[in-house]
């Protein structure tokens, strides 16, 4: 076991704070409509240019192990906010840095860190309650477009495209984003289906950056039972290998020897394959497998129908233009099923919905209907260069996540105004002692941090703008950094999803409060490089 270096109290917190500030300084420049881009060097290919906070945070690894601990903790804030809300990562980082910075000062002044943490928790709970109370439901396609535009850094075409996509496939519909082969960004709605089953092994992953399987024009084998051995499957696997196309295997389960054999073949490059469990349970699973078979112009392989695995031929397999599989879901895009067959299946499900008296059955049938009839909206991102496409794709992903969050929990005034106005929830709120109350005041000050940063990035003085807004009784009034004017944020269409704002504050408060209570830090002592051997037996150059 290697020797450890230990840091205590103020020294430990100072090192943590330095790491937090380094990460915060790199991320905060991206905040707001006039936020700047960050250029990230890649091990291969062109550098990446992005304005996405979490993408910047994920790249930061510091040399000093103690400073790196602080940076990694705040990176966790950005990642968690991204996982839960899909946007607001820069706001979360700025909030976390502000809370920890103020908290570290008070701990250094002799206040109790545990009481400060209790105060921070109380403050965050009160503000979250206020944000939820002020959230307004999204009623129109125009409001969805506004949310998307703000999250895409003011790009109205992206906002409108996402609103159109949601119109076509519904708010809960499947919308995927992929790179186009042209310079234009376009929206396409294709026949498709998504179900909540992910890949059975991470070894099937083809896109390591996004941890997902991407299969182009695959064959699809739909099988009703479990697969424990591949013996019966060998003839059809060999036939698929001859075509050079990938294969998606959907069955009740793939386990043991069968799964191991598929993984080994995938790793060796002999067979491009992925396996997922069939969605649903019991009779519903069977019905959903039949839906998939109809959608992909394949046959469900079932012994009830007298079809055995060893007798399966290529023409019994389904086919689709593209399949995307991540850890939790599978999306089949543009299946080869005939429109008439799909429509007949849809009519059959509609008839079942009318006949059933069970609310539960009706709900599940409607889910199946939505999967078959809704289709999948595909946003194809175009650009002049690969770097431009990747940067635009980041913004579209953010905008898509933000609009979904807005539909879920409503919208609040954007530009940091919702957090600034939520300060009223902390007015008069006190704790059981002075230190707890001081913790509440840390949150009070932190609520100004995002709007100050947005204004600073626009080239103005944050204190002046915050002072002017504090003197206004209009809760929707804010500063439009794009036009450099004071406006009604809701009327101007500058809105944020309530879920994004709430999640950013909760995650920032949680991690920053933990950092404040840190008293000791332990890290490995870096290994000293062994001295290189001297040339010529240590005698130096001999002149020839």
Swiss-Prot record:
Organism domain of life: Bacteria
Q: Which reaction does it catalyse?
A: ATP + H2O + a folded polypeptide = ADP + phosphate + an unfolded polypeptide
- Listed GO molecular functions? ATP binding; ATP-dependent protein folding chaperone; isomerase activity; unfolded protein binding
Q: What is its EC number?
A: 5.6.1.7
For this UniProt record, the keywords arranged alphabetically read as follows: ATP-binding, Chaperone, Cytoplasm, Isomerase, Nucleotide-binding
Q: What class of enzyme is it?
A: isomerase
Biological process terms in GO annotation: protein refolding
A single GO CC term for this protein reads: cytoplasm
Cell compartment(s), UniProt: Cytoplasm
Classification via PROSITE patterns = CHAPERONINS_CPN60
Q: Which CDD domains match?
A: GroEL
Task: Indicate which residues the UniProt annotation says bind ATP.
Answer: 30-33, 51, 87-91, 415, 496
Among InterPro entries, the record links this protein to: Chaperonin_Cpn60_CS, Cpn60/GroEL, Cpn60/GroEL/TCP-1, GroEL-like_apical_dom_sf, GROEL-like_equatorial_sf, TCP-1-like_intermed_sf
Provide the family line.
Belongs to the chaperonin (HSP60) family.
Spell out the subunit comment. Forms a cylinder of 14 subunits composed of two heptameric rings stacked back-to-back. Interacts with the co-chaperonin GroES.
Q: Which HAMAP family match?
A: CH60
Under the heading NCBIfam families, the entry gives: GroEL, PRK00013.1, PRK12849.1, PRK12850.1, PRK12851.1
Q: What does this protein do?
A: Together with its co-chaperonin GroES, plays an essential role in assisting protein folding. The GroEL-GroES system forms a nano-cage that allows encapsulation of the non-native substrate proteins and provides a physical environment optimized to promote and accelerate protein folding.
| Protein name, UniProt field | Chaperonin GroEL 2
């Amino acid at each position: 076991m290697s020797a450890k270096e230990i840091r205590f109290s103020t020294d430990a917190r100072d090192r943590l704070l330095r790491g937090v500030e380094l990460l915060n300084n790199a991320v905060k420049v991206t905040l707001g409509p006039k936020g700047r881009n960050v250029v990230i060097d890649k091990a291969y290919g062109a550098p990446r240019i992005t304005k996405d906070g979490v993408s910047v945070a994920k790249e930061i690894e510091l040399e000093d192990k103690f400073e790196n601990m602080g940076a990694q903790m705040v990176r966790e804030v950005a990642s968690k906010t991204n996982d839960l809300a899909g946007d607001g990562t820069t706001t979360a980082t700025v909030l976390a840095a502000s809370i920890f910075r103020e908290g570290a000062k008070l701990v250094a002044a002799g206040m109790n860190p545990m009481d400060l943490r209790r105060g921070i928790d109380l403050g965050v709970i009160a503000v979250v309650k206020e944000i939820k109370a002020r959230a307004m439901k999204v009623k129109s396609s125009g409001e969805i477009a506004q949310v998307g535009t703000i999250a895409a850094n003011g790009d109205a075409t992206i906002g409108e495209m996402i609103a159109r996509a949601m119109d076509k496939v519904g708010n809960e519909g499947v919308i995927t984003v992929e790179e186009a082969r042209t310079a234009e960004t376009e929206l396409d709605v294709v026949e498709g289906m998504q179900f909540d089953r992910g890949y059975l092994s991470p070894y099937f992953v083809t896109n390591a950056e996004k941890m997902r399987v991407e299969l182009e024009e695959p064959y699809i084998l739909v099988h009703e039972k479990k697969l424990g051995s591949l013996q019966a499957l060998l003839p059809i696997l060999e036939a698929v290998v001859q075509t050079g196309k990938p294969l998606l295997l959907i069955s009740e389960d793939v386990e043991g020897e069968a799964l191991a054999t598929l993984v080994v073949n995938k790793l060796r490059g002999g067979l491009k394959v992925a396996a997922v469990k069939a969605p649903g349970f019991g009779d519903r699973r069977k019905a959903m497998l039949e839906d998939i078979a109809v959608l992909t112009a394949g046959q469900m392989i079932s012994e009830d129908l007298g079809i055995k695995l060893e007798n399966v031929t290529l023409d019994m397999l389904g086919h689709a233009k593209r399949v995307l599989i991540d850890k939790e879901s599978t999306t089949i895009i543009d299946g080869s099923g005939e429109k008439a067959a799909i429509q007949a299946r849809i009519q059959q499900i509609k008839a079942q919905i009318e006949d059933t008296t069970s609310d539960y059955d009706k709900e599940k049938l409607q889910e199946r209907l939505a999967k078959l009839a809704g289709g999948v909206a595909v946003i194809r991102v175009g650009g002049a260069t690969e770097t431009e496409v990747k940067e635009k794709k980041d913004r579209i992903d953010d905008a898509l996540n933000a609009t979904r969050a807005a539909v879920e929990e409503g919208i609040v005034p954007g530009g940091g105004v919702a957090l600034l106005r939520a300060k009223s929830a902390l007015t008069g709120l006190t704790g059981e002692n002075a230190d707890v109350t001081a913790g509440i005041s840390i949150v009070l000050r932190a609520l100004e941090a995002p709007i100050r940063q947005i204004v600073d990035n626009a080239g103005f003085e944050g204190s002046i703008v915050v002072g002017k807004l504090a003197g206004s009784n209009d809760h929707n009034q804010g500063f439009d950094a794009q036009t450099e004017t004071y406006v009604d944020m809701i009327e101007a269409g500058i809105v944020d999803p309530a879920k994004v704002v709430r999640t950013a504050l909760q995650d920032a408060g949680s991690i920053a409060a933990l950092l404040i209570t840190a008293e000791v830090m332990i890290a490995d002592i870096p290994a000293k490089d062994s001295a290189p051997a001297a040339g010529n037996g240590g005698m130096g150059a001999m002149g020839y």
